[in-house]
């Protein structure tokens, strides 16, 4: 499923509901929006002040948003596509604005002793490169360590402005 929108707003924004809204909340909001916009009904039904309709949103957009978000399978596919689209644009759902990856998601180059990953935004093949030496330096410089969480390093793509948090653990087999 591709996420297409002429106005570049999500179905959630069209309906004015949060991403975690229940199907019942979506249904109620949809009905209130239609009543508010309907030329015959809007005069006889009291206006609900909780309903905020974005400027420029059409009835067709509202109907399409409801069709997708009220169906569990379509909604799950839409959420995946929306998430993928946001990642390519450099956005994510974390409050700090950074995507999180585990070092296990990187490919290890044994010759260079480097972990390499393609950038999820610009698709640069060597977008993220972390050497073992760099990771060891980060540990020595006092990165936060926790038995459960391990270590974390921030790194920027070599080809674009995307920053990632990379989580990793130390393997103590050498001791």
UniProtKB/Swiss-Prot annotation:
SUPFAM superfamilies: Chaperone J-domain (SSF46565), CSL zinc finger (SSF144217)
GO function term, MF aspect, one: ATPase activator activity
The protein's role, per its UniProt record: Required for the first step of diphthamide biosynthesis, the transfer of 3-amino-3-carboxypropyl from S-adenosyl-L-methionine to a histidine residue. Diphthamide is a post-translational modification of histidine which occurs in elongation factor 2.
Major location (coarse): cytoplasm
Residues binding Zn(2+): 119, 122, 157, 160
GO CC terms, sorted: cytoplasm; nucleus
Domain of life: Eukaryota
GO BP, sorted A to Z: protein histidyl modification to diphthamide
Annotated InterPro entries: DnaJ_domain (IPR001623), DPH_MB_dom (IPR007872), DPH_MB_sf (IPR036671), J_dom_sf (IPR036869)
The name this protein goes by in its record: Diphthamide biosynthesis protein 4
Biological pathway: Protein modification; peptidyl-diphthamide biosynthesis
DPH-type MB domain span: 97-169
Keyword Membrane: no
UniProt keyword annotations, A-Z: Cytoplasm, Iron, Metal-binding, Nucleus, Zinc
Record family assignment: Belongs to the DPH4 family.
Subcellular location: Cytoplasm; Nucleus
Organism: Candida glabrata (strain ATCC 2001 / BCRC 20586 / JCM 3761 / NBRC 0622 / NRRL Y-65 / CBS 138)
All copies of domain J, residue ranges: 10-82
Domains: entry comment: The DPH-type metal-binding (MB) domain can bind either zinc or iron ions.
Family annotation (Pfam families): DnaJ, Zn_ribbon_CSL
């Amino acid at each position: 499923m591709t996420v297409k929108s002429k106005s570049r707003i999500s179905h959630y924004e069209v309906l004015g509901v949060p991403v975690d809204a229940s199907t019942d909340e979506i249904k109620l909001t949809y009905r209130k929006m239609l009543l508010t916009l309907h030329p015959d009904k809007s005069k006889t039904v009291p206006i609900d002040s909780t309903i905020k309709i974005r400027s420029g949103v059409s009835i067709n957009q509202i109907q399409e948003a409801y069709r997708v978000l009220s169906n569990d399978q379509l909604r799950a596919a839409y959420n995946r596509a929306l998430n993928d689209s946001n990642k390519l644009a450099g956005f994510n759902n974390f409050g700090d604005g950074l995507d999180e990856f585990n070092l296990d998601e990187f490919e290890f180059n044994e010759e260079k002793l480097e972990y390499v990953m393609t950038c999820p935004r610009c698709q640069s093949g060597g977008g993220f490169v972390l050497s073992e030496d760099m990771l060891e330096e980060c540990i020595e410089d006092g990165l936060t360590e926790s038995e459960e969480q391990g270590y974390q390093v921030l790194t920027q793509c070599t080809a674009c402005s995307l920053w990632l948090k990379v989580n990793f653990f130390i393997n103590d087999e050498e001791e």
